[in-house]
């Protein structure tokens, strides 16, 4: 089984992710854009039990803008780590947090909110897949 290590910007918090993600892609929602201070968020989705804080758990802060997303960050440097989605039993570990993971996007979600069009041939979902409560509808690139 593969194990990938990650850490915050200053290294006070370290994590591991075990196995392979449930999915990976790009989120274009306003919430992710605002949180990441960028036009798109590269995500990797893991089952909750695959993600472990291995160092500095006392330095992990949390912000709940919604009940669906519990955003975790380092209290020392402010570096973003991951977002826990308890309703789905999934954790979104930002691709940049685990630099050795061979990121390969498979989908764009919330593309209807996109401010950066990406013509890469991947499926573009209007919101979320239907199994996660979205419409599952695709939109043009």
Can you say where each PLM-predicted feature lies in the sequence?
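A short Gly-Trp-Pro
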Residues: 1-141
